[in-house]
Amino acid sequence: MASDIDQKDVDYAAKNLKLTTSLVANKPKDCPPEAPWGACYRVEINLENTGSKSLNENVEIYFSSIHRTLGSKSEEFKVEHINGDLHKITTTEKFKGLKGGKTKSFQVDFMNWIVSNSDFMPNYYVASEHLEGRNILNTVPIDAVHITEEVSGFTTGIKHTPNQLKRTANDLLPAATATTRYEQYSKVKDLGADAVSAHILPTPLETSVHEGSLNIAQGINIVSDALPADQVEALNFRFETLGVNTGTGVPVNVTIKADSSKKSGSYTLDVTSSGIRIVGVDKAGAFYGVQSLAGLVTVGKDTINQVSINDEPRLDYRGMHMDVSRNFHSKELVFRFLDQMAAYKMNKFHFHLADDEGWRLEINGLPELTQVGAHRCHDVEQNKCMMPQLGSGAELPNNGSGYYTREDYKEILAYASARNIQVIPSMDMPGHSLAAVKSMEARYRKFMAEGDVVKAEMYLLSDPNDTTQYYSIQHYQDNTINPCMESSFVFMDKVIDEINKLHKEGGQPLTDYHIGADETAGAWGDSPECRKMFVAPESGVKNAKDINGYFINRISHILDAKGLTLGAWNDGLSHKALDASSLAGNPPKAWVWGTMFWGGVDQYNSFANKGYDVVVTPPDAYYFDMPYENDPEERGYYWATRFNDTKKVFSFMPENVPANVEWMTDRMGAKISATTGEKTHDFLGVQGALWSETIRTDAQVEYMVLPRMIAVAERGWHKASWEEEHKEGITYTSNVDGHEGTTHLNDNIATRDADWAHFSNILGYKEMPKLDKAGITYRLPVLGAVIKNNILDVVTEFHGVAIQYSLDGKTWHKYDDTKKPQVSTKALVRSVSTNGRTGRAVEVLAK
């Protein structure tokens, strides 16, 4: 750029520019011909110079867009894609200046569509050449859980009109409104607090409720030599959080009695007038028995029901995945996350610590991984940080920056162990590895400058002579580790060794290591290092398509030599040569994430039949970065499904994936079909997953995960009577939302809905007050309501949650269903927690 710009010009622009955006339309009539499937959307950007000086023409504005630009419609402004979601606005030779007090507007096209306000990424920033970047002040997000409020400083968001709410003409899904929610939630009966007081989540195998109750006003005292001290401490913390004293009061006798006929984690719990007795078949069972005792507690009550429970887990693996790479989240959040996992008997924590956007774990001997790879700021050379992504902005600190020290990680391991949770670390490779690649390139440059070629090349992950051109699914062009270089395996061996040491020091020996294994289509083809392998018969690699299989096989031997089991996403294991028996070591684990409508239905059984231990992780049911409902005011991506509400999570039958098609549609609401194939092996378990691209704060994590996580815990622990058994050769077709399909599930739908009513009543009356006591910012239900005959009628998704209404948007009143208020025109309604936190308010209009 020209030399007539300095840091003062950048600072002035960031301070005095007011940048706002608005959606013009999804799929305008003149989409550029290069738009994939002819789909694009158009955004208007307004630049207002609120200062007195003219804007320097050499100032550049950077911003994040998860969809790649198709170009500007303006003659004065150019918009170009940089890498990932990072884009840049520059002026053209036709730019006529932007004087103080003036505004310029222009329109930009992007690929695909936009129907959630979380697609509007914050922290536009100003920069030029190697000057320091500065965030444009009005685009800095407001600290809020609700997305529309968070981005309200710079975007008007998506309007409730067809050309903005609908992605294409084939989008059949109705928008969520107060009326549609009313119609849905009115079908769920309010059972009342007394009816669910003796019931817990996840649902036990057998529960007998007896007459009478046990007073625990003085507290409970866990008496056990069977449980280690750290687990007793964790359990006491659970009770104290719920307001129950520990170390005094009613004795809780906990013992272990081995029984080989029962599953690990099985237990019995007896609450009688004389005391409490828990017998586990092992330490896990004893621990879960005490958690079930906590489940009997109703916040604010001094008594629990007298019951007898005989219980065992349905599936061995009951997990949650948390991505801290896209946006970093605090150690304290991880602790709270583990607390809630333990409360609902989840036992596997899939900890996603490295991806394109960040490396989050300190690795001894490789400081660049956290010095560079753990931070995002404006550094074109990427010697001190990664370039901004996902609206992280130019300035430090930000939500895209941070990492766990070695001591932090060991604390997390100890905290998880005390809650009977295994931590499964995941560093994504060879794809999704930009942070690692750029960190090692920075290391390379540092040692080359010192003249130490051996050190420089020791851990290098990229071939500097590779001219391959590709785009990853997130629009990166350089995010893939090169498996044709020996230094890549030296790096991975080093990382795995260091993580292995951390687990030993943290008291939880490493057994499973998740390598991600995502493949970047189109990578490596023009790498000279790879071309050497293509002509070497002993390599077994004939072309670029064989490289990922070679990589997986080689990593399996590295892990096996260390006594570790390989885990990976199923797409990375899809190479034709990669049956489980072809890989070294124990049967590998495959986390299968096929969607219902992209042919993913068949992948679950297919990988199990190949000998993999399958963890069921369907995006269109168990991905919690998807919105709760079809409303632009709900945060989340929607590439797999337009919404995953709690009932949908609850209803998903994990052991017969094709059968779910009968009550589901594709992401546009169209009919889908699936046929059950051969299934020779049972699945290992289930996992909910949180990817954090749109989730910047700890509170937003809790909002997106809970209460949906409890529904995954329910399906992982308890097999419901209404779940369809797997039978080969049965075809299922959508029979919902106006589609006439198969009716295999008809007899079970009413039973499922009654079970949902029971589950949701327990959530509202018992579990949400417990989450309040724990300080969890879970999603309060958005209400359904209508005004009929001048009477306001309001319903909630979870009975037991308090409701408020307002006639002026300022004064709020408690809603009493027995004395429904008179309203002539409109009202606002919202839910409110037991500790005074309020849910998203919605407007209700009289018909």
Curated annotation (Swiss-Prot):
Active site residues according to the UniProt entry: E519
E.C. no: 3.2.1.52
The keyword Chaperone is assigned to this record: no
Name this polypeptide is given: Beta-hexosaminidase
Known role: Hydrolysis of terminal, non-reducing N-acetyl-beta-D-glucosamine residues in chitobiose and higher analogs, and in glycoproteins.
Origin: domain of life: Bacteria
Gene name in the database record: hex
Disulfide bonds: C31-C40, C377-C385, C484-C530
